[in-house]
Curated annotation (Swiss-Prot):
GO molecular function, one term: identical protein binding
Protein name per the record: CTP synthase
Residue stretches making up the Glutamine amidotransferase type-1 domain: 308-556
Binding of UTP, residues: S23, K203, T204, K205, P206, T207, Q208, K239
Key word Isomerase present: no
Amino acid sequence: MSIKRAQLGGTTKHIFVTGGVVSSLGKGLTAASLGNLLTARGLRVVMQKLDPYLNVDPGTMNPFQHGEVFVTDDGAETDLDIGHYERFLDINLGQSANVTTGQIYSNVIAKERRGEYLGDTVQVIPHITDEIKRRMRLQAQPGPDGDPAPDVIITEIGGTVGDIESQPFIESARQVRHELGRKNCFFVHVSLVPFMNASGEQKTKPTQHSVAALRSIGIQPDALVLRSDRPVSEPNKRKIALMCDVDEAAVVNAVDVPSIYDIPSMLHDQGLDAYIIDQLGLTQAADVDWAGWSRLLEAVHDPKHTVTIGLVGKYIDLPDAYLSVTEALCSGGFAHDAKVALKWIASDECQTADGAAAQLSDVDGICVPGGFGVRGIEGKLGALRFARENGIPALGLCLGLQCMVIEYARNEAGLAGASSSEFDPDTAFPVIATMAEQVDIIAGGDLGGTMRLGLYPAALAGGSIVAELYGAAEVSERHRHRYEVNKAYRAQIADAGLWFSGTSPDGHLVECVELPRDVHPFYVGTQAHPELRSRPNRAHPLFAGLIGAALDRQKASLLFDVAADA
């Protein structure tokens, strides 16, 4: 089924980003950087990631295999690249921004069961590719609130050219170009140029073969982004341009840089955005406005302070499992002209008081992020107790808040052995319990996409740290959880001194906890995932608050040392 011109959503252009040779080349960062540049030129840009796995979404995938699950405002569980897109473009994306093979096949099979194909033999071409094209063009329509259609849709195709799994997506992109016309589509291919230590030279052949594979399925790339650990020589760039039939001006080198936020300026300096604008006829594009991004880069490269934050987690062997958390912490540092030195701490190392002291004695603050399952929980409790008793600024996220409640219940509220029904169904004091609406879902075994997901409001108590940081009495944050603070124990825990400073507007769900400032300088937990709405040039208030408190502790420690020496 061809895309009809009347249904094109105006003059929306498509940029497709593919990858070759190896995975994890940085296609997502390349796509996000292009989006950043085009947005800085005044264009309306939306982003999309096509994932070739058969999972419907990454919500039930192992963090060690997939990395973090990025949740959007509308409750979609998506790929971590969606987080890059939101941070680089400073936009909020939705469910349509992430498409998986599992979603495509589920939709097609459901249509077949309903008889919508009128007895046709359902095949990859045209039925699967038609559904992919429909999803590709979904964001080309005007917004529900009257927002105009975007000028550009940038679509990253996951996987590596040549993989069986990604072939339907690449074929669909080829068909979109055929149906919309070559002046409305642009293909960027990201490829590796490896350096061979034995011969002391860079090799262009892998890129040539990767482009040949792409051309064999009907796509001639319009631009090449060459990934390398050192600059690609001009002769090699000219050779690649010749052998791959790409304009020399469209062959750019994305060399490893100190910060991911340097990538947009690196691509701009080589003229990639200008070339794309010219080829797509985006005459409405203005010059790049670097004002906001330049201030960010100054904070990145010229920090006035350095602060050490311990990230106490159970998935630290794969940092991508906490990608948005680490980016939010760094952004909190940018807001204070500070470099955040992350100390990765396996929560198991903090189970004992001595272990927690050994791991946390040299940090200025800690962050305890979300997670699932019982492994590592006692270590998180140990880390939080050490931070609470020693005045170390601490921020708990989702499970981190729940651990704050459990630790306080055990050690301050007289509820020895308190736990969560997630970890210990038989605990005498289930201070964290399954949400009422989740009980039947868990019993039914339907775990995919069934948590409390997406944007929910919270009412903040006047005079609280969280209300001060947000500068508002009510805020909305993204959530991803099945468990909540058990209302039956709230009064007893609050009487012991832990302040439930944020709740759902109806007062039913606990959204924030904290210790008063006269008890602890910064001990704050949130049931939400505020890291998902943080931006590099606009740090989230809770993360900025943590870094500010950590800097205050650091300065106080230095003053104490000076006084002691005197």
